[in-house]
């Protein structure tokens, strides 16, 4: 496990999402990945579902005239038999066209990363929001 590899993975991963590259961003998940967030009634399973959610988010930001930037910080990582468990704080900054940036959300992101063909991929992601009770 190399912390620089993990940092570079998250930088590329979030730049794809923030840049509107929904399909490429979904490609940084395993084909059978699980993505769970408080805004979802059920976890999304599979790369196709993750891509659909990302496309909807990109379209929503465009309609709102906002740019979002995901800031991944304070990442800890440990190797397990199933891959790498990574826990990060994530702040999402939203900037409306012609306006001032604001903190949109503050979250904790818990990932299980795996290596496939030498590349890190997200196999599982669980997000909790700081403004909502856990559970």
How would you describe each model-predicted region?
Residues 22-90:
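A solvent-exposed, acidic/Ser-Thr-rich amphipathic alpha-helical stretch
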Residues 13-14, 47, 90, 102:
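Generic N-terminal initiation segments characterized by hydrophobic and/or small/turn-forming residues
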Residues 1-19, 23-27:
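Short, low-complexity N-terminal intrinsically disordered segments enriched in polar/charged residues
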Residues 4-8, 48, 104:
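A generic "alpha-helical surface" signal
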Residues 59-135:
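A beta-strand edge to alpha-helix "cap/lid" segment located at domain peripheries
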């Amino acid at each position: 496990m190399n912390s620089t590899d993990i940092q570079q993975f998250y930088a590329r991963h979030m730049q794809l999402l923030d840049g509107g590259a929904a399909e490429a961003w979904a490609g940084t998940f395993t084909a059978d990945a699980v993505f769970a967030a408080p805004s979802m009634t059920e976890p999304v399973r599979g790369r196709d579902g993750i891509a659909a959610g990302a496309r909807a988010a990109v379209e929503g930001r465009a309609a709102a005239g906002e740019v979002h930037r995901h800031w991944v910080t304070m990442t800890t990582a440990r190797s397990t038999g199933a891959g790498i468990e990574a826990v990060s704080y994530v702040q999402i900054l939203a900037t409306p066209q012609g306006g001032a940036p604001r903190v949109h959300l503050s979250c904790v992101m818990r990932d299980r990363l795996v290596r496939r063909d030498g590349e890190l991929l997200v196999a599982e992601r669980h997000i909790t929001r700081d403004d909502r009770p856990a559970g």
